[in-house]
Design a protein with these regions (language model features):
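Active-site catalytic motif of lipid deacylating hydrolases and related acyltransferases
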Residues: 2-61
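Catalytic histidine neighborhood in serine/cysteine hydrolases
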Residues: 32, 146-162
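Flexible "cap/lid" loop of the alpha/beta hydrolase fold
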Residues: 42-50, 94-118, 165
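Catalytic histidine-centered segment of alpha/beta-hydrolase-like enzymes
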Residues: 44, 158-170
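Gly/Ala-rich beta-loop-alpha elbow adjacent to hydrolase catalytic centers
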Residues: 66-76
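A conserved short beta-strand
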Residues: 84-97
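Short beta-strand/loop motif that positions the catalytic acidic residue
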Residues: 121, 126-129, 133
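Conserved alpha/beta-hydrolase "acid-adjacent" motif
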Residues: 134-140
Length: 182
C-alpha cells in the first residue's frame, strides 16, 4: 500500500504541511508516502498534470490518495481515468466546480467528474475544510463531500491550511488519514 500526496495551485511537494504528514505517516504508520511534485503549479495545465500522474503513480488497488485544493480535483481525475479499486481518499479544501475566487483553475473543472465511475472505486473517503477559508470557501468543499458521500470535517479555523501554523503541521489530516486506513 502506498499513499500519494497531490499538492495544489502555486504549491509544491515540500510546501505547507505535506512534509510533516509524510514523515508522520512513514514513522507512525509505516506506510510509504510519496509527495507528487506537479510541474508549473503557478500555471497548471490539466493534461500536463494527468501525464505527470501517469509516470509517477503505480495504479494499484488499495492505494491511498491525499489531495489539497487543486490537488483534490486532480485526485478525482486520476480515479476517473484508471481502473483501480478499494482506493482510500483524503481531500483537504477540495472542489469539483468552478470557484469565483480562482477562475484561473476553471480548466480543471470544465468537464464534470463522472461520479458513477469514481464512487465504486473508493473504499473510504473523508473531506476536510475550515469555515474561514478565503481561497476555497467551505460550501464548495461541502458540495464535493456530498458528491462523494464522504465524511465531512469542518474546522472552526485554519483558512486554507497553507501555513498550518508556525510548525507546519495539520494534525486533523493525520488523524483522519489514520482512521481511513483502519
Amino acid at each position: 500500500m502506498t499513499i500519494y500526496m497531490f499538492h495544489g495551485y502555486t504549491s509544491s511537494a515540500n510546501d505547507h504541511w505535506f512534509p510533516w504528514l509524510a514523515e508522520k505517516v512513514e514513522a507512525e504508520l509505516n506506510i510509504p508516502f510519496k509527495k507528487l511534485d506537479f510541474p508549473d503549479s503557478d500555471h497548471p495545465v490539466e493534461s500536463v498534470w494527468d501525464q505527470y500522474c501517469e509516470t509517477h503513480i503505480n495504479p494499484k488497488d488499495g492505494i491511498t490518495l491525499v489531495g489539497h485544493s487543486l490537488g483534490c480535483i486532480q485526485v478525482l481525475h486520476y480515479l476517473d481515468q484508471h481502473d483501480i479499486h478499494n482506493v482510500n481518499v483524503l481531500l483537504v479544501f477540495g472542489f469539483d466546480e468552478s470557484i469565483w475566487t480562482l477562475p484561473e483553475l476553471n480548466s480543471f473543472t470544465d468537464h464534470p467528474v463522472d461520479y458513477s465511475n469514481v464512487l465504486p472505486k473508493i473504499l473510504k473517503v473523508t473531506v476536510i475544510s475550515a469555515i474561514n477559508d478565503d481561497s476555497v470557501p467551505y460550501p464548495y468543499t461541502l458540495t464535493l463531500a456530498r458528491h462523494l458521500h464522504a465524511k465531512f470535517v469542518l474546522m472552526p479555523s485554519g483558512h486554507h491550511f497553507t501555513d498550518a501554523g508556525k510548525d507546519k503541521q495539520l494534525p486533523i489530516a493525520f488523524e483522519e488519514l489514520r482512521q481511513i486506513l483502519r
